[in-house]
Amino acid sequence: MSRLEAKKPSLCKSEPLTTERVRTTLSVFKRIVTSCYGPSGRLKQLHNGFGGYVCTTSQSSALLSHLLVTHPILKILTTSIQNHVSSFSDCGLFTAILCCNLIENVQRLDLTPTTVIRLNKHLLSLCISYLKSETCGCRIPVDFGSTQILLCFVRSVLTSKPACMLTRKETEHVSALILRAFLLTIPENAEGHIILGKSLIVPLKGQRVIDSTVLPGILIEMSEVQLMRLLPIKKSTALKVALFCTTLSGDISDTGEGTVVVSYGVSLENAALDQLLNLGRQLISDHVDLVLCQKVIHPSLKQFLNMHRIIAIDRIGVTLMEPLTKMTGTQPIGSLGSISPNSYGSVKDVCTAKFGSKHFFHLIPNEATICSLLLCNRNDTAWDELKLTCQTALHVLQLTLKEPWALLGGGCTETHLAAYIRHKTHNDPESILKDDECTQTELQLIAEAFCSALESVVGSLEHDGGEILTDMKYGHLWSVQADSPCVANWPDLLSQCGCGLYNSQEELNWSFLRSTRRPFVPQTCLPHEAVGSASNLTLDCLTAKLSGLQVAVETANLILDLSYVIEDKN
């Protein structure tokens, strides 16, 4: 069939960052992500023009998945951030804001993209080396033998998501539950390479947050009538389990384009049922106590198994198959033929449970590396946001188990890092440039743009007109409320720095963020007594933050290096 209209030529635009449309698009995107940042970030409601589901969030994962992006440059930016978030769960907004700030700041400089990219790479390498070094002044070790730092981690994630709508008491309760759920996934007698279990989040919407709880094992939601039909099992030893990933309904499988030849007088339904009953007889002879099926079990097979005191539960769904396999040690059975003895697994016990208006069949494991977090919240919107936040917190703990270090949060790492870069580029530029073709003047310009981008991320934490200061000893962030007097004694207005490590009773000098000041050496090597005495720190995941920093700089470099954008308009 011929085309109804002629094919349009592709649009080719050179120097895309110089166009007003691109700058406006990036500016709008920056304002969106900046306004969401931090504990007092503003919420966003996203929905399509045809109505339907409305997403209320301030999290980057939900925000970017619901945000329709059409411009190629913005697609590069959002895709990079989404890839980072899918791998690390945390620091998505940090990455987005830093990337936008870097692009915006260097555009004001009269430097070639090649020079900017080369120096950005040098500064990124300097940041990563410092944050991984023993002398880093914003990195603390994480002791998994103590719950204090771990609770700080979880609490920091929860308090940064205002759409969860948690009170302080609820935050403490959910933090403790998340930590307990994570610890339950760690094998007790693990040596060498550790394989973590899994935490399943079970929804209980419309309930009080304080009613949330954690149980070892897996909860299978069922109706009250179904639970009443299940026979109780009284056994002193473990219960033998068979897990089926194929249908046990007796339906004839789809033959595709093939032909099924059936002899005269043979009933396919009866033949299929006979095969199912033969399978049931093998399960009985193998002393199976519990049959779980991903799909449907034929009513006759169910009744047959129940007569022999075997519990049969169907319609488990694909989501629970992997956790059930891990917890029970079964190999999912995919055929109706003879079953290998190695396919069976076991559970310690089973029982019924009721939470709110929901009824569950509770599988209790032999070893608790699979657990269920029953998560409650007042409404669907708050629950959806809390679920995402809990998943992020659990992932952050997993990342920290691999690399047991934390960065000071609340903006203190960014201001400390900016102070360190300024000092390093002013006092030891040769160590950064080495044999590079760039000059010290170019380094100073890019370093200031880089530090300003970091400080702009920190500035995004303030949404209510307050001021942000940094001290001249540690390089930490300090917040002043909007209604504070213009001329005041700073120690009277400042209580703690952003991360909560230092208080204003020390003899410190402060200056406004982004004000002109002489570069200084921020104190490195955190004293252990300072970290040990702090009980309510705000912390960031080192692994996620380093990745976010790297993704932001590399994505900014990629966008700055674009010479042409070619769009197919057909």
From Swiss-Prot:
Q: Where in the cell is it found?
A: Cytoplasm, Cytoskeleton, Microtubule organizing center, Centrosome; Cytoplasm, Cytosol; Nucleus
State the disulfide connectivity: none
* Function, as annotated: Probable molecular chaperone that assists the folding of proteins upon ATP hydrolysis. Plays a role in the assembly of BBSome, a complex involved in ciliogenesis regulating transports vesicles to the cilia. May play a role in protein processing in limb, cardiac and reproductive system development. May play a role in cytokinesis.
Q: Which family does it belong to?
A: Belongs to the TCP-1 chaperonin family.
* Alphabetically ordered keywords of this record: ATP-binding, Chaperone, Cytoplasm, Cytoskeleton, Nucleotide-binding, Nucleus
Which InterPro entries does the UniProt record give? Cpn60/GroEL/TCP-1 (IPR002423), GroEL-like_apical_dom_sf (IPR027409), GROEL-like_equatorial_sf (IPR027413), MKKS (IPR028790), TCP-1-like_intermed_sf (IPR027410)
Annotated GO CC locations: centrosome; cytoplasm; cytosol; kinociliary basal body; nucleus
Pfam entry (one): Cpn60_TCP1
Q: Which SUPFAM superfamilies match?
A: GroEL apical domain-like, GroEL equatorial domain-like
Q: Assembly state and interactors?
A: Component of a complex composed at least of MKKS, BBS10, BBS12, TCP1, CCT2, CCT3, CCT4, CCT5 and CCT8. Interacts with STUB1. Interacts with BBS2 (via coiled coil domain). Interacts with CCDC28B. Interacts with BBS12. Interacts with SMARCC1, a component of the SWI/SNF complexes; the interaction takes place predominantly in the cytoplasm and may modulate SMARCC1 location. Interacts with DLEC1.
The Gene Ontology terms for molecular function here are: ATP binding; unfolded protein binding
Task: Provide the residue positions that the database annotates as binding ATP.
Answer: G192, H193, I194, I195, L196, G197, K198, S199
Q: List the top taxonomic levels of the source.
A: Eukaryota, Metazoa, Chordata, Craniata, Vertebrata
GO biological process terms held by the UniProt record: chaperone-mediated protein complex assembly; cilium assembly; developmental process; intracellular transport; protein folding
Give TM regions: none
Q: What is this protein called?
A: Molecular chaperone MKKS
Annotated region Substrate-binding apical domain: the residues are 198-370
